[in-house]
Design a protein with these regions (language model features):
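Active-site metal-binding loops of divalent metal-dependent hydrolases
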Residues: 1-3, 44-47, 71-73, 106-107, ...
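Conserved beta-sheet core of the metallophosphoesterase superfamily
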Residues: 82-177
Length: 180
């Protein structure tokens, strides 16, 4: 999400005039997608600034948020926001509807689990639809069971498990077609 990160607008060519517009759009999209009791896994680079900025954002977001730390989050560990999350960690393995999922801020070519049976969801890179954007060239070796859940790649909205399943199944099918 990169809340309060002014440079990300220019760096990633985000379609916002300023930080306030970006924050408000993402908060609105989030709350229109996520219910009060929904579980959210945020894959890092949540917010820049200190505990005041983090608190302003967290006070407005729906859901029970698990934070997988990103490179921009590490320096804020001491700021007092950690207790606002359900859990804060560097990585996480979860299972949803019998689907094993590995969560990390970074994409990995080697990760814990079988590449056909385990999904890997990540952030960090700033791609857009159809594998475009500033980091797209570096991602050409990803497995079809991996996906960038970052906001630039998902219309500045959270992605549900049902949406993920459709996306990853489509990526797997596209690879099968290419291999034939």
């Amino acid at each position: 999400t990169h809340f309060y990160h002014g440079n990300i607008i220019r760096f990633c060519n985000r379609p916002f005039e300023d930080v306030e517009m970006m924050n408000e759009t993402i908060i609105s999209n989030w709350n229109n997608t996520v219910g009060l009791d929904d579980t959210v896994f945020h894959l890092g680079d949540f917010c820049l600034g200190g505990s005041a900025e983090w608190t302003k954002i967290l006070d407005r977001l729906n859901g029970k948020i698990y934070l997988i730390l990103g490179n921009h989050d590490l320096k804020n560990l001491r700021q007092g926001y950690v207790d606002r999350f359900e859990h804060v960690t560097m990585q996480m393995h979860i299972e949803v509807d019998k689907q094993k999922i590995y969560l990390n801020h970074y994409p990995f070519l080697c990760f814990d689990g079988g590449y056909k049976d385990v999904w890997q969801l990540f952030g960090h890179v700033h791609t857009r639809k159809n594998n475009t954007g500033i980091d797209a060239a570096r991602l050409q070796y990803l497995y079809p069971t991996q996906y960038d859940v970052g906001v630039e790649n998902n219309n500045f909205m959270p992605v549900s498990f049902a949406q993920m399943k459709i996306i990853i199944e489509k990526q797997v099918e596209q690879l099968k077609m290419k291999e034939q």
